[in-house]
C-alpha cells in the first residue's frame, strides 16, 4: 500500500502554507510529490506588520520545497473574503527553530 500525505484532497483547492522561515503563502494547490514539494498557482504572499495592513505580494505559479514547509492548511474562501486585510495588524511569524 502506498503512503499518502493527505494532500490528495486539497489538489485544485486554495491552501495556506506557513514556511519554516515564517512566510505565509496562499494559492491553489496544483500538485505535489513524495517529498511534499508543492506547486501553487495564482499564489501570493501575505506580509504581516504591526504598523500597517497586510501586504499581498503576487507570486503567480510558485514551487515550495517540502523541507521548507511548516504547515499546510485548507483555506475557507468565504471567511477569507470577509476579512479586511488593510486593517489587519499582526506580528510577522518568526522562523521555526528546530
From Swiss-Prot:
Disrupted-gene phenotype: Developmental alterations, such as reduced root length, alterations in the shape and number of cotyledons, small rosette leaves with short petioles, early flowering, short siliques with reduced seed number and frequently aborted seeds. Lower pre-mRNA splicing events and reduced levels of U6 snRNA, but elevated levels of U4 snRNA.
Its predominant location is nucleus
Q: Which UniProt keywords apply?
A: mRNA processing, mRNA splicing, Nucleus, Ribonucleoprotein, RNA-binding, Spliceosome
Q: Which GO terms describe its cellular component?
A: Lsm2-8 complex; nucleus; spliceosomal complex; U4/U6 x U5 tri-snRNP complex; U6 snRNP
* GO MF term list: RNA binding
CDD domains hit by this protein: LSm8
Q: Where in the cell is it found?
A: Nucleus
Q: Name one GO biological process term.
A: mRNA splicing, via spliceosome
Tissue distribution of the protein? Expressed in roots, leaves, stems, flowers and siliques.
Residues forming the Sm domain are 2-78
InterPro entries in the cross-refs: Lsm8 (IPR034103), LSM_dom_sf (IPR010920), PTHR15588 (IPR044642), Sm (IPR047575), Sm_dom_euk/arc (IPR001163)
**UniProt-listed PROSITE patterns:** SM
Superkingdom classification of source: Eukaryota
What's the subunit arrangement here? Component of the heptameric LSM2-LSM8 complex that forms a seven-membered ring structure with a donut shape. The LSM subunits are arranged in the order LSM8, LSM2, LSM3, LSM6, LSM5, LSM7 and LSM4. LSM8 subunit interacts only with its two neighboring subunits, LSM2 and LSM4. Interacts with the prefoldin co-chaperone subunits PFD1, PFD2, PFD3, PFD4, PFD5 and PFD6.
Instruction: Explain the purpose of this protein.
Output: Component of the nuclear LSM2-LSM8 complex which is involved splicing nuclear mRNAs. LSM2-LSM8 binds directly to the U6 small nuclear RNAs (snRNAs). LSM8 is essential for the formation of the nuclear LSM2-LSM8 complex involved in the accurate splicing of selected development-related mRNAs through the stabilization of the spliceosomal U6 snRNA. Plays a critical role in the regulation of development-related gene expression.
The entry assigns this protein to a family as follows: Belongs to the snRNP Sm proteins family.
Q: What's the protein called, per UniProt? A: Sm-like protein LSM8
Please tell me the species this chain comes from: Arabidopsis thaliana (Mouse-ear cress)
Amino acid at each position: 500500500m502506498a503512503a499518502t500525505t493527505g494532500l490528495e484532497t486539497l489538489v485544485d483547492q486554495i491552501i495556506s502554507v506557513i514556511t519554516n522561515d515564517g512566510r505565509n503563502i496562499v494559492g491553489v494547490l496544483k500538485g505535489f510529490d513524495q517529498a511534499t514539494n508543492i506547486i501553487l498557482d495564482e499564489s501570493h504572499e501575505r506580509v504581516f506588520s504591526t504598523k500597517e495592513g497586510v501586504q499581498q505580494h503576487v507570486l503567480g505559479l510558485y514551487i515550495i520545497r517540502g523541507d521548507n514547509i511548516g504547515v499546510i492548511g485548507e483555506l475557507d474562501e468565504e471567511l477569507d473574503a470577509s476579512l479586511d486585510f488593510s486593517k489587519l495588524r499582526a506580528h510577522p511569524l518568526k522562523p521555526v527553530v528546530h
